[in-house]
Amino acid sequence: MSKIKDAFTKGKAFIPFISAGDHGIENTERYIRVMVKAGADMVEIGIPFSDPTAEGPVIQEASTRALSTGVKIHDIFDMVHRLRTGDDAVTVPLVFMTYLNPIYVFGREKFFTLCEEVGISGVIVPDMPFEEKGELGSIANKHGVEVVSLIAPTSENRIEMIAKEAEGFIYCVSSLGVTGMRSEIKTDIKSIVETIRKYTDIPVAVGFGISTPDQAEAMARVSDGAIVGSAIVK
């Protein structure tokens, strides 16, 4: 069983998001430890980027604040290394949320080599088309890193295509558009998850727009877990 899938074996998974470097990398490390002690089953760590096209204003502003501190990708890898070592080592899966540009600029092989060395279990790359997953995925898999697929409201044919190739877990996008808190989630998540489960037994976690405990509970009822980002970052 993959490290990521293992996070879903204890029940419904709670997956918080944090933007690395926002308010300083030392605080990011501290917040992640607090999240894990509070019961997070996996933590999604956002690598700040100047053009985060999938993000709403809250996470965009967090990225801008992080970049203004001068945080670099190497600093984030060093932080993850600290989290993974010592008597108080964090053992839950840690996944990066990033974009193609930072990976390519840093160097794909170098990026995934360091992911393997420090203990990153997976990456989420929202601006990578499914059709282009192959090359990046092969490099990631060589280093034991899973590339998480996103599924938004779309045709069953496309859901089938993505679900059959998924690894780790599937990130089910609750609302079209960018991330951010929504007062109401109108998408029929239950039917999307049921469609996904026709083609794979990979866990499905719902994200984008979850802003209240009630919403998180509702999404977890029809899936395997809930991802909460903007509400935590705010």
Regions found by a protein language model. Give the residues of each.
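Glycine-rich phosphate-binding active-site loops on the catalytic face of alpha/beta enzymes
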Residues: 40-52, 120-124, 128-132, 174-180, ...
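Catalytic beta/alpha-barrel core
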Residues: 68-70, 119-132, 146-154, 160, ...
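N-terminal amphipathic alpha-helix/helix-capping segment at the start of soluble metabolic enzymes
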Residues: 1-15, 79-85
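Glycine/Thr-rich beta-alpha phosphate-binding loop at enzyme active sites
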Residues: 59, 159-198
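Hydrophobic faces of well-ordered beta-strands that scaffold small-molecule active sites
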Residues: 14-18, 43-45, 94-98, 123-125, ...
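Active-site beta->alpha loop and helix N-cap motifs at the rims of alpha/beta catalytic domains
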Residues: 47-49, 60-125
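Catalytic cores of alpha/beta
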Residues: 25-36, 154-164, 206, 210-226
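Glycine-rich beta-to-alpha transition loops that act as phosphate-gripper elements at the mouths
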Residues: 19-24, 97-105, 129-130, 150-154, ...
